[in-house]
């Protein structure tokens, strides 16, 4: 954009001040992100946003591996119980259909009692694996805070950059785009003067000639 071509006299000092303010805001936000007390113990060694994203990816991968390992360990336990129960059920059905000799009946009863005696142990093993799956989800508390804070930072930067653009474009373009400045909102509540999607952000930039 050329101030001479548009008839506007841009104020370089004001633009520089805005950029400086944006830089300070970014640095302050990143500093706050690094020192946030809720995640300090787990993430205080991560110095910048790139490392934070790597941290989120690592935590997610670790949780996925824990879930997969627990599932793979619990599967054979459940399969074994299912096969044992099915085999006993078939043997009992055969006895009902045709009475067994005493030694065979005694063996069936003993096998059934042995199966039932092993059920609590198998149940405890399965419960332990289920608890491991539940505990693997604890990463969401930490990574969720990191992601939400970074989203807030990105949203604030986007709004500030859009405001800088609006303040330095011709008046006719500013009037067209100004109603979209209020920024992306998850729940616009029926308002027509807010940006509700990334497409509208793109439309706003297009209306400004970018």
UniProtKB/Swiss-Prot annotation:
SUPFAM superfamilies: Chemotaxis phosphatase CheZ. GO terms for biological process: archaeal or bacterial-type flagellum-dependent cell motility; chemotaxis; regulation of chemotaxis. One of its GO terms (molecular function) is phosphoprotein phosphatase activity. It holds the Pfam family CheZ. NCBIfam families: PRK11166.1 (NF008368). Belongs to the CheZ family. Plays an important role in bacterial chemotaxis signal transduction pathway by accelerating the dephosphorylation of phosphorylated CheY (CheY-P). This is Protein phosphatase CheZ. It comes from Bordetella pertussis (strain Tohama I / ATCC BAA-589 / NCTC 13251).
């Amino acid at each position: 954009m050329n101030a001479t071509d548009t008839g506007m006299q841009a104020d370089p000092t004001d633009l520089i001040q805005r950029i400086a303010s944006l830089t300070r805001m970014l640095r302050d936000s990143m500093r706050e992100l690094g020192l946030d007390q809720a995640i300090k113990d787990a993430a205080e060694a991560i110095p910048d946003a790139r490392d934070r994203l790597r941290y989120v990816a690592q935590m997610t991968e670790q949780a996925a591996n824990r879930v997969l390992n627990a599932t793979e360990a619990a599967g054979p336990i459940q399969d074994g119980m299912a096969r044992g129960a099915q085999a006993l059920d078939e043997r009992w059905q055969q006895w009902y259909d045709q009475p067994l000799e005493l030694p065979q009946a005694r063996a069936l009863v003993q096998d059934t009692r042995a199966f039932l005696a092993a059920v609590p142990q198998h149940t405890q093993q399965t419960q332990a694996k289920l608890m491991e799956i539940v505990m693997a989800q604890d990463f969401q508390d930490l990574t969720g805070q990191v992601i939400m804070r970074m989203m807030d930072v990105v949203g604030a930067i986007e709004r500030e950059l859009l405001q800088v653009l609006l303040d330095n474009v011709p008046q006719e373009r500013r009037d067209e785009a100004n109603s979209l400045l209020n920024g992306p909102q998850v729940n616009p509540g029926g308002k027509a003067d807010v940006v509700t999607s990334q497409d509208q952000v793109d439309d706003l930039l297009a209306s400004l000639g970018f």
